[in-house]
Amino acid sequence: MYAVIKTGGKQYRVAAGEKIKVEQIAAEVGQEIVIDQVLAVGNGAELKVGTPLVSGATVKATVVAHGKHDKVRIFKLRRRKHYQKRQGHRQQFTELQIQAIAA
């Protein structure tokens, strides 16, 4: 069984037992969270697609860790003008362990 969930402005295909990295969620490590924005639920050949959400469907997950992705380096240059700008960014994430999918 799998589900398509929406969190942090992105969509993820998840199944029970998987670990995924999502945009940072304000939750403690070890805390169990319930994601109720489920866009689709599939079980073998059967697929239930919401309009836009599947009513009554939830995904339970446990927060495993918080962290930062690798650094992304931004370099801007204006040719012939002696203008250079360097910038870096590390996006924060939350790692989730998917426990169960209830449809």
Curated annotation (Swiss-Prot):
GO terms for cellular component: cytoplasm; ribonucleoprotein complex; ribosome. Part of the 50S ribosomal subunit. Contacts protein L20. GO terms for biological process: translation. Belongs to the bacterial ribosomal protein bL21 family. This protein binds to 23S rRNA in the presence of protein L20. GO terms for molecular function: rRNA binding; structural constituent of ribosome. This is Large ribosomal subunit protein bL21. It holds the Pfam family Ribosomal_L21p. It comes from the Bacteria. Keywords: Ribonucleoprotein, Ribosomal protein, RNA-binding, rRNA-binding.
